[in-house]
Amino acid sequence: MKYLVKFFVVTFLLLICTHVSAEQKIAYLDMKFVLNNSNAGKGAQDFLQKSFKENQKKFVDEENALKKEENDLLAQKTILTKEEYQKKSDNLRKKVIDYQSQRRLSLEKITTQRAEARQKLLEILDPILKTYTEENNISLVIDKKDVLVGNTDLDITNIIVKKLNKKLPSLSIK
């Protein structure tokens, strides 16, 4: 008799728990898609890629010039005196160090700009998501990358992208 009562109590509790979870409305959102395919996100990415390519071209040209200077210096090694060679070699090392420093600073600047653009997008996206979840009685929004299998009706990505495009058509990056 004791076991029968325990069985009914456990069964009753399980049924209550499943009923409560059935009332929760859950949706999922592909954050990567939203950030990369919204108008503001695309504009920011295009700007950052263009900036990176311009810097890359400039640095490749500068690197080639440094390599040429190094080869010229090595070719003149037998002609130059030891002091002149040492002086030119030290000068070349300083140029290489400056080049590496400029390249690092350029990459850091682009990384910082990317992080700032992402942060701005997320700041604008947060109230849009809150408003949408309140209007549609959604209890929980999960990132799509954390969902193994889900009904496509629960995917709110395209709706949020449209709302984000309406609210933020472009993003300025400094």
Task: Tell me what each language-model feature is.
Residues E23-V147, K167-K174:
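Amphipathic alpha-helical segments
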Residues N151:
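Active-site microenvironments of hydrolase-like enzyme catalytic domains
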